[in-house]
């Protein structure tokens, strides 16, 4: 689960980190009033979406004119912002963040992730702030400095000083950086973060450190113990099909291909996508119905797959272990009848009651293509998607 910038900054403020005074606004009038409450003669207005690249897409504006703030808010509120990190539809803008403007002397980067290799929280800092850190990692990896947090001892001030020295900070800035580092590390564990970024962490013209932006990703598996964070979830930023799938405990990820995939088990689902690719097809989704699939969930999975207009054929690949193949077959038949499937459906069943499942499908009278193996299923569904 991701947070908006204004939500991230509210958490930063709770831990004593330096952030700009700002207000998240729902209307153009609120945005104008927010500028008045902040004071000064220069403000920054930002569209609030769960995607980077807002500035290049026109979603960030610096202005000293309150009427320009009104015009910006009226233009974006209720519309979708398309950036390099979104699909062609973009993400809806429901709030505008109005902040005081900060005079910048230099831009740094500070972030943290859970590193699967070390099984530790790893902090990363760089002098290359304000740009995509992935680009820095690829082109100049020596400019990224790391600190690994030991879960037994927690974050240590010496780690902050080591990073600060590599960033070229002076003694005053070093103290500020240590406070920021310790606060972020504590926050990361307290709230079960999976990702944290301040890009840029700026040095102001007065020589102070300031958190100019904030990006936070939460470990979805830990939300049960984070009610405050869970309440910050903005469902409008989620893919509609993914959100619908989550209601039925289906693991669904939308992709850009034309072969719909319904599989039980994440590993088998990834293998199915690979073999579809191997035979020249492009998966339209990842969908794992899980080991405890019911007829209702299978039917719902079918509806979700077919709600994607790009899907030209569907591959159902089921290995019956916990779940019975005959039950899956009944779910497929029910969904095909209920939804009125107009695209070819290729089914491969193996495992518990596989023969019975194939028999149920054969007697259904529906136009369902039975596959003898996974390779056969992939070949058949790719041909079907191409209209052959």
Swiss-Prot record:
Family: Belongs to the succinate/malate CoA ligase beta subunit family.
Keyword Aminoacyl-tRNA synthetase: no
Residues engaged in binding Mg(2+): 199, 213
Catalytic activity, reaction form: succinate + ATP + CoA = succinyl-CoA + ADP + phosphate; GTP + succinate + CoA = succinyl-CoA + GDP + phosphate
Database matches in PROSITE patterns: ATP_GRASP, SUCCINYL_COA_LIG_3
Name of the gene encoding the protein in the UniProt record: sucC
Domain called ATP-grasp: residue spans: 9-244
Role of this protein: Succinyl-CoA synthetase functions in the citric acid cycle (TCA), coupling the hydrolysis of succinyl-CoA to the synthesis of either ATP or GTP and thus represents the only step of substrate-level phosphorylation in the TCA. The beta subunit provides nucleotide specificity of the enzyme and binds the substrate succinate, while the binding sites for coenzyme A and phosphate are found in the alpha subunit.
The protein's name: Succinate--CoA ligase [ADP-forming] subunit beta
EC number: 6.2.1.5
Gene Ontology MF, one: magnesium ion binding
Highest classification ranks of the organism: Bacteria, Pseudomonadati, Pseudomonadota, Gammaproteobacteria, Alteromonadales
GO cellular component, one term: succinate-CoA ligase complex
Keyword terms, alphabetized: ATP-binding, Ligase, Magnesium, Metal-binding, Nucleotide-binding, Tricarboxylic acid cycle
């Amino acid at each position: 689960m991701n947070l908006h910038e204004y939500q991230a900054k509210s958490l930063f403020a709770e831990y004593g980190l330096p952030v700009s005074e700002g207000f998240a606004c729902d209307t153009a009038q609120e945005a104008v009033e927010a500028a008045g409450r902040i004071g000064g003669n220069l403000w920054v207005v930002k569209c609030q979406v769960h995607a980077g690249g807002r500035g290049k897409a026109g979603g960030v504006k610096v202005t000293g004119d309150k009427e320009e703030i009104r015009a910006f808010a009226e233009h974006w509120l209720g519309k979708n912002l398309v950036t390099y990190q979104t699909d062609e539809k973009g993400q809806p803008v429901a709030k505008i963040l109005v902040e005081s403007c900060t005079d910048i002397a230099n831009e740094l980067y500070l972030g943290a992730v859970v590193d699967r290799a070390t099984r530790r929280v790893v902090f990363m800092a760089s002098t290359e702030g304000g740009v995509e850190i992935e680009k820095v990692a690829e082109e100049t990896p020596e400019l990224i400095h790391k600190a690994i947090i030991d879960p037994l001892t927690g974050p240590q001030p010496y780690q902050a000083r080591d990073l600060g020295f590599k960033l070229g900070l002076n003694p005053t800035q070093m103290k500020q950086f240590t406070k920021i580092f310790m606060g972020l590390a504590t926050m990361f564990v307290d709230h079960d973060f999976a990702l944290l970024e301040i890009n840029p962490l700026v040095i102001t013209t007065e020589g102070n450190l300031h958190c100019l932006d904030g990006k936070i990703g939460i470990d979805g598996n830990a939300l049960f113990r984070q009610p405050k964070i869970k309440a910050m979830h903005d469902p409008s930023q989620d893919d509609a099909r993914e959100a619908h799938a989550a209601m039925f405990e289906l693991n669904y990820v939308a992709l850009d291909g034309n072969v719909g995939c319904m599989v039980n088990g994440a590993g088998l689902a990834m293998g199915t996508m690979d073999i579809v690719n191997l035979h020249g097809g492009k998966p339209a989704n990842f969908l794992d119905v899980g080991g405890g699939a019911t007829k209702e969930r299978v039917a719902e999975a079918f509806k979700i797959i077919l709600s994607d207009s790009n899907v030209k054929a569907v591959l159902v690949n089921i290995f019956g272990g916990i779940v019975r193949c005959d039950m899956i077959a009944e779910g497929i038949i029910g969904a095909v009848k209920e939804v009125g499937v107009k695209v070819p459906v290729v089914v491969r069943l193996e495992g518990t009651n596989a023969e019975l499942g194939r028999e149920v499908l054969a007697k259904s009278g529906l136009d369902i293509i039975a596959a003898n193996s996974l390779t056969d299923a992939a070949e058949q569904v790719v041909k079907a998607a191409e209209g052959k």
